[in-house]
């Protein structure tokens, strides 16, 4: 049997409080801290910071 992978699916939620989110994955071994990345929010039509949240 193969070992379980280190990548985990995460959700990037907009800090503009629009409810918009992106889904992606990250390697927990290389990046144990929470991810923050600047991406485009189509609701407000601006680039805003997206923060990591758990996928429910």
UniProtKB/Swiss-Prot annotation:
It holds the Pfam family Ribosomal_L33. One of its GO terms (biological process) is translation. Keywords: Ribonucleoprotein, Ribosomal protein. Transmembrane segments: none annotated. It comes from the Bacteria. GO terms for cellular component: cytosolic large ribosomal subunit. GO terms for molecular function: structural constituent of ribosome. Belongs to the bacterial ribosomal protein bL33 family. PANTHER family: 54S RIBOSOMAL PROTEIN L39, MITOCHONDRIAL, LARGE RIBOSOMAL SUBUNIT PROTEIN BL33M. HAMAP family: Ribosomal_bL33. This is Large ribosomal subunit protein bL33. It comes from Haemophilus influenzae (strain ATCC 51907 / DSM 11121 / KW20 / Rd). The gene is rpmG.
